[in-house]
């Protein structure tokens, strides 16, 4: 009888160690420049990043966004990939995030959301 209890306790201990070693890892924290999308706007409509960095877009709203090269100008969409800018064409679902390609050229670049009028972001890339 005692032998069965002792064996059961040993097996239970081994199972506990095995399960503890398979613990759930927390997600990696977001690192790098971040643009937050709140409702139909960028939280900040300008940002400065370093050459070679990418931008992480965090959609904190319940509506999807599309981020592309260009800008809203006088109420009209002006789609344009400026010289030196990475080509950006991202669909970002509600409460999700996406990352652009890196900005490898210094300069000022425009990005916008074509489904939300007036939603523009100006990115300044420095050396």
Model-derived features: where do they sit?
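Extracytoplasmic copper-binding redox domains, predominantly the cupredoxin/blue-copper superfamily
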Residues: 2, 21-127
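Sec-dependent bacterial lipoprotein signal peptides
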Residues: 1-20
């Amino acid at each position: 009888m005692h032998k069965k209890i002792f064996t059961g306790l040993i097996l239970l201990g081994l199972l506990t160690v095995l399960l503890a070693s398979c613990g759930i890892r927390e997600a990696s924290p977001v690192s790098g420049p971040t643009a937050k999308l709140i409702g139909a706007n960028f939280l900040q409509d300008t940002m400065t990043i370093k050459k070679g960095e990418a931008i992480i877009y965090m959609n904190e709203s319940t509506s999807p966004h599309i981020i592309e090269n260009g800008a809203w100008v006088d109420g009209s969409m002006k789609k344009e990939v400026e010289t030196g800018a990475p080509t950006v064409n991202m669909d970002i679902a509600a409460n999700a995030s996406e990352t652009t390609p890196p900005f490898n050229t210094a300069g000022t670049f425009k990005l916008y959301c074509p489904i939300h009028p007036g939603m523009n972001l100006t990115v300044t890339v420095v050396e």
